[in-house]
Amino acid sequence: MIKNIWNKPIKRFTLIVLVSCILSFILYGPFLYQFITKGIVFSGSGDGFRQMMPFQMHLYEHFTSLKGFYDASFGLGGDYVKSLAYYYSLSPLMWINFSMIWILEQTINVNPHDISFWTINQLIMAYVRSVITFIFSFYLFSYLRLKPAPMF
């Protein structure tokens, strides 16, 4: 049965995505549990990770309001896209994420202007990145045709 699925590219891709989703869910299970029970996202309250949520919210608000790249409210004024490029502003996943958030904001009235929204968004995006990483890694290792190394 597995061989039958494996020989058809669409079914193989579906199986790889399904396995990647399951593995990612197992990987992020403890983080989801901590978030649900304690309200902690990935680590603690003083983590640098918490800096990224306001940065994401700031970028989202500027991109959706179609403001220019220079903003006087960013520190002493500056190019926020260049300054936040290391974090998010040039990531293709960020653009897709912001597009989906904007669509959800317009259709089902989610509130991305509240900082608590971005904690949930961080968990979802971390899960999505993990699934994508598993899929790309599988295809990369298949392309490289790695053979098992002898133990001794």
Describe each region flagged by the PLM.
Residues 1-34:
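Start-transfer (signal-anchor) and selected internal transmembrane alpha helices
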Residues 10-11, 113-117, 144-148:
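Membrane-interfacial loop-to-helix junctions in multi-pass inner-membrane proteins
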Residues 18, 127, 134, 149-151:
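Hydrophobic transmembrane helix bundles of membrane-integrated enzymes that assemble
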Residues 137-152:
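Transmembrane-helix signature of polytopic, membrane-embedded enzymes
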Residues 24-134:
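Membrane-interface coil-to-helix junctions
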